[in-house]
């Protein structure tokens, strides 16, 4: 055994007793459907790959070690990672105690409770992770459709502390090249928003509306990223029960999208990063907060646009949230998504553009997404 393999073995990354396989040299859970493949990394729980079986492009091609050369940890954010117990920075005191930017969920080893198992219309896997500093436990159920390029994730967070606490939970899907390029289009039904660069205590001024942001006095269209990522983080709210976001890459012939209940995840946070004059990464982040600040600031601010910017979990309490992810093949002249409609078992994309009647439909099979009936 070479030195690298020995080190990984000592850290548990090559444990032969685990029901996982190696993907890019890392322990992973690989789920193989009839239409698509899904890969989850054990060293941080990130969804590192979601691709069609007959197409090599992986939209979630992101590694934090490439974005930040100082990031050398084996347990690190990749692809679509989970921000838990926070989104963004820690206080100086929390940093001294070892808490991470974006929380611990992508910095701990996850355990497989149930390896990928065929359950008829879908492949199911169960995973869990304990966050020792946060005092939280997260359990994840993944159902990959056998009949379409879609999967449903249900995550339960339990407060293991002796006291209740505030926390946040943000999904951080991150797209990268070659899927991400100058022709990649991001669409959403998001509405009212603000730039994270706007100063406290009223960062919600000035107000912007999707897909626009402001750079000085000039409007920026967030649908497309070219060579300038300023402003690099802009956050939005929703007026509909279902929130959705899509990223279309016509040159790659592929679209990735997410759909969720806006009562569970009321915020959409758009992160953009360009490098050497080209798009390098885009975060399509949906979650329980839209303010990229430590908890003392969140607690003082409380709400923005009448939406909460943190949530509370009592001792022993469990909270569950779901989302649906999907892939579509698209033509080279695709103009993006105007609207997404969803009924249990049926997902439809309506194309943008005047006079456009093209629709792309997907039967998600036995993957129901529970949408609450109350307004957000």
Regions picked out by a protein language model, each given a short descriptive name:
Residues 17-152, 163-376:
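Surface-exposed acidic/polar loop and edge beta-strand patches at domain peripheries
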């Amino acid at each position: 055994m070479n030195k690298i393999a020995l080190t990984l073995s000592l850290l548990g990354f090559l444990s032969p007793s685990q029901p996982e396989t190696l993907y890019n040299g890392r322990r992973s859970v690989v789920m193989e459907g009839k239409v698509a493949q899904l890969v989850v990394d054990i060293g941080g729980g990130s969804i590192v790959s979601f691709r069609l079986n007959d197409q090599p492009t992986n939209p979630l091609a992101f590694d934090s070690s490439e974005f930040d050369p100082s990031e050398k940890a084996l347990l690190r954010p990749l692809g679509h990672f989970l921000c838990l117990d926070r989104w963004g920075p820690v206080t100086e005191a929390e940093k001294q105690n070892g808490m991470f930017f974006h929380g611990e969920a992508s910095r701990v080893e996850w355990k497989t409770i149930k390896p990928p198992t065929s359950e008829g219309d879908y492949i199911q896997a169960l995973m869990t992770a304990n966050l020792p500093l946060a005092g939280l436990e997260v359990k994840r159920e993944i159902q990959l459709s056998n009949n379409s390029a879609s999967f449903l994730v249900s995550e339960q967070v339990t407060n293991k502390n002796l006291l209740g606490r505030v926390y946040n939970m943000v999904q951080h899907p991150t797209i990268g090249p070659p899927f991400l390029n100058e022709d990649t289009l991001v669409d959403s039904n998001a509405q009212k928003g603000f730039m994270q660069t706007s100063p406290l205590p009223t960062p919600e001024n000035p107000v912007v509306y999707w897909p626009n942001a402001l750079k000085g006095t000039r409007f920026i269209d967030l649908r497309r990223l070219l060579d300038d990522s300023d402003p690099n983080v802009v956050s939005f709210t929703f007026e509909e029960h279902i929130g959705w976001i899509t990223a279309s890459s016509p040159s790659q012939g592929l679209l990735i999208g997410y759909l969720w209940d806006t009562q569970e995840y009321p915020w959409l946070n758009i992160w953009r990063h360009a490098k050497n004059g080209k798009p390098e990464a885009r975060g399509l982040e949906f979650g329980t907060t839209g303010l990229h600040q430590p908890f003392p600031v969140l607690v003082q601010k409380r709400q923005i646009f009448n939406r909460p910017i943190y949530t509370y979990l009592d001792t022993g309490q469990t909270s569950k949230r779901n989302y649906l992810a999907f892939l579509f093949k698209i033509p080279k002249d695709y103009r993006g998504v105007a609207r997404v409609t969803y009924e249990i078992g049926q997902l439809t994309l309506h194309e943008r553009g005047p006079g456009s009647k093209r629709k792309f439909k997907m039967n998600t099979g036995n993957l129901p997404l529970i949408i609450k009936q109350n307004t957000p």
